[in-house]
Amino acid sequence: MMTTIFVTGGTGLTGANVCQQLIERGDEVRALVRNPDEAPALAAIGVNLIQGDITDSSDVRRAAEGADAAIHCAALLGGARQDLADFEAVNMTGTSNVLDAGRDLGMRRVVALSTGTFFDLGAGVSAEEAPVLDNPPDDPYTVTKLAAFREVHARAAAGEDVLTCHPGAIYGPSLVPHRALHPTSFNAILLGALRGRTPMFLDFPVTWVAASDVASGSIAALDRGVAGERYWLVGRPEDEKSTAAGCNRACELAGVDHRVQDLDYRSDPEGLTAAFGPTLMAIAEAAAKATRTPRQCDNPTSRRLGYQPMSLDEGLGLLILWLRELGKI
């Protein structure tokens, strides 16, 4: 039976993959986007692109009318420059608007995509059960995503059918290339390395995950998840490695001689914050001070959702093929 799913952030890397997979399995998709003209490939496969702003509750409700459930992908991501008010509007108010629409329109479930930057991953428990850090990073991205996470789970505790998914470092092909290659994306970092333009990058462990896996995991959470739970949508445990190491593996697979060097966040805190932004600096600092609990292949997310991500080599291979088809490398 065909269902109608409301997707926010439909032109973003994850959102576009979610829309594509929902269409491929026979669902109707209503996607809230700022500019429908940006995504002709989504319209071509049958996605109903509805113009609107995630920060406007009336826009969100109008776009969500008739939907049976929602996957909330829209977010403002951390970059070198971060204005708290902008992040509050998108990551907090936007999430509230989607949750309100889900409740008021009687949706069966809302899946909200979150992040892992505020969890204590060295607490000796699985990531799905990890507590929030006593002193989480105070960059605008983390602050606002944590507030949104808390709202989702407060609503779940009050009886709403809502849950969160927590992706790692997302990369891979998309039907909306210019959005998938946004300067703050891991795709852009990988492309820079493949072009020999990324000399070094902050050193911290990266849970590389293909966008198509994040999409399939989010859809599985919609179908098989449990209200109030959270799911860790990352790559395989053996593929966790620094950004430089991930870039270097991409270069090896593509036959590119360039190599990226790891960069210690302590070498120039002020300069590196200006270059990489407060979110990545906070992640690097937290990682250097913590002992992470090793991720197991048998984990709550895999057991509940049947989530089995592809290997980093497979994902990078798909990315390289896509970039070549686009004429980027």
Regions found by a protein language model. Give the residues of each.
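N-terminal Rossmann NAD(P)H-binding glycine-rich loop of SDR-like oxidoreductase domains
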Residues: 5-25
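NAD(P)H-binding glycine-rich loop region in Rossmannoid oxidoreductase-like domains
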Residues: 37-43, 47-93, 101
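NAD(P)-dependent short-chain dehydrogenase/reductase
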Residues: 161-164, 168-206
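Active-site Tyr-X1-5-Lys
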Residues: 138-163
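Substrate-positioning beta->alpha
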Residues: 182-185, 200-222, 229
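Conserved C-terminal active-site "lid" loop/helix of NAD(P)H-dependent oxidoreductases
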Residues: 211, 270-308
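Conserved Rossmann-fold NAD(P)-dependent oxidoreductase catalytic core, especially the SDR/UDP-sugar
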Residues: 93-141, 163
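Mid/C-terminal beta-alpha module of Rossmann-like enzyme folds, strongest
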Residues: 217-283, 312-313, 317-329
